[in-house]
């Protein structure tokens, strides 16, 4: 994200409302300080959770600047999950969602990340938070069937499975399994899938998991990137509806869910909720969270 885009994003972020100057001062301090300090910086985050961040890291620096980079979705996770729930993070990257679920909340987790550099950063953050006993990190892709896939390896948080005919990039070969095979009957309460357009294939290999009544919700990236593989995102929505889920958006300040007819037009991610009244009760009874001095 370029600096002008970053400034716009920070200025408009819900946790920075009424605090624009303070947020921009934090951004400027990071731009200067991160270049003066050699190596990664430990950032104290939420409820004692922390992460290692380096200058230029796209996903994690968003949390430095705003508190919660993807506010609605991350707050939904924090309000929904309870200690010892099972959380599955498909496309974990450096582990933002895994850290929130397993370090801040105390849930158990599976974190899937096939990119070698991102996987190294993920495991660093798991060790930093001393949650190795609660998180299983797996350096692999998930898809519709077992096999292998070529991945880009030089696009930071935008690394993805190479599409047919995609021009040459630096690539690595990754193993592919299915979510159903890996979980082998374990029952998550929440699944997050952010695999840069490969979401439809992941869901195809997760049909047994999607049918589990204990799966309360899923956070799925739907931003048009599936077109590179010939996937129609309306089919992703239809798949989730077919498994009994409702598309929703979430307001963390009012702790209210709003039902949607399809993907969330205001976000790159869409929440899918199985039992809206049950999930709403969990959300409203969760303890308050404080991030960057804002409580919700």
Task: Outline where the language-model segments fall.
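Phosphate/nucleotide-binding beta-alpha loop and adjacent structural elements of enzyme active sites
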Residues: 1-296
């Amino acid at each position: 994200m370029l600096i002008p885009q970053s400034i716009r994003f920070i200025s408009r972020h819900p946790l920075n409302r009424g605090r624009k100057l303070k947020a921009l001062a934090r951004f400027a301090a990071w731009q200067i300080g991160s270049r003066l300090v050699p190596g990664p910086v430990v950032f104290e985050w939420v409820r004692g959770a922390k992460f290692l961040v380096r200058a230029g890291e796209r996903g994690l620096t968003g949390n430095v600047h705003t508190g919660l980079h993807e506010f609605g979705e991350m707050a939904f996770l924090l309000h929904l999950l309870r200690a010892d729930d099972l959380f599955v993070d498909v496309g974990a990257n450096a582990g933002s969602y895994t850290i929130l679920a397993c370090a801040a909340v105390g849930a158990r987790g599976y974190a899937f990340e096939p990119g070698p550099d991102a996987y190294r950063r993920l495991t660093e953050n798991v060790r930093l938070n001393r949650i190795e006993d609660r998180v299983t990190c797996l350096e692999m892709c998930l898809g519709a069937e077992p096999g292998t896939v070529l991945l880009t390896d030089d696009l930071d948080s935008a690394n993805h499975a190479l599409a047919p005919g995609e021009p040459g990039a630096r690539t690595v070969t990754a193993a592919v399994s299915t979510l159903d095979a890996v979980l082998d009957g374990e029952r998550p309460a929440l699944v997050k899938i952010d695999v840069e357009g490969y979401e439809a294939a992941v869901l195809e290999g997760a049909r047994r998991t999607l049918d589990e009544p204990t799966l309360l919700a899923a956070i799925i990236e739907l931003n048009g990137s599936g077109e590179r593989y010939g996937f129609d995102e309306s089919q992703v929505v239809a798949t989730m509806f077919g498994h009994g889920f409702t598309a929703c958006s979430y307001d963390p300040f009012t702790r209210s869910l709003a039902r949607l007819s399809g993907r969330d037009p205001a976000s790159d991610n869409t929440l899918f909720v199985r039992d809206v009244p049950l999930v709403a009760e969990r959300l409203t009874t969760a303890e308050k969270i404080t991030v960057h001095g804002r409580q919700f």
